[in-house]
Amino acid sequence: WTEHALINTVSPNPRFAERCATQVIELIRQNFNHPSIVFWGIGNDCQTQRVAAAKPLLEMLAREVRLEDPDRLSTIATNYGELFGAYGLDSVAHNKYQGWYSATPDEFAPWLDTQRAKSPGQSIGMSEFGAGAGVNTHRAPGVRMDHSEEYQAYYHEVYWRALRDRPWVWCKAIWQMFDAASAGRNEGELPGINDKGLVTRDRLTRKDAFYWYKANWNDEPMVYVTSRRFTPRSVAQTEIKIYSNC
C-alpha cells in the first residue's frame, strides 16, 4: 500500500483537484516497478461528510488510478465509514480508534460486525488502529488516553482478538511500528511526538504491546513479563501479566 498525500482537508478550488491528479499520476509512474505494491491509496481521512468537493475529487482520483495502472487495486483509508465500492474504488479500509479518542476498545468488534452487515460478502480493511504510550508512563489499570504502557497493551489485546476472529478483514495495519515526529501534538511524555508506536522513536525500546504481537505472530518460543518498567509501585500487591507463545 502506497498512498497519495491527500489527508483531511479538501479544497473546492479546481487547481487543488488538478494538483491531486498530477500527484497520483506521479506516484504511480515513479513507483509502479516495485513488486511489493498491491494497492494505490488515493487519500486518508478526507472530509467526505463535510466538504461537497470531496466526493467528486475522490471519484476522479480513482479513475486516474485505473487508467494509470489497471492491474493493481485502488483503495482509501477513511474514518468516515464509507462502504465497499465507494468512489468507484476497488477496496476501502478504515481508521478506527475506539477506546482511544472515544468510546472503549470493546466497541470495536461490534462495529466490525455492523460494517460487515451493511456490506455482506465484501471484505473490510483496517488501515489504522492504535493507542499511545510512553515507556515511563504507567498505571494499573490503565485508562483511555493516559499514555500508559498498560493501557496501550490492553487496547491491542482487545483489538487483535477481534481481528483474529474475523478473517474477512482483509488488512490489519497497526498505527504504528515506531513513535514518530508530529509537530501539532502536545500529549504523552514528549511534545511533538505521536507515541502510538510499538517501539520508541529511537528504535531502542520495545513497548509491552510489541511483545503481545510477538507472542501471537512469531513461532519462536518466547516469554515476556509486562510492566517491567513500572517501578516503584504504589500498592503492596500487584497483578503480573505475561505474554508467551509456549
Set out the residue ranges of the language-model regions.
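Extended substrate-binding grooves/exosites of carbohydrate-active enzymes
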Residues: 1-246
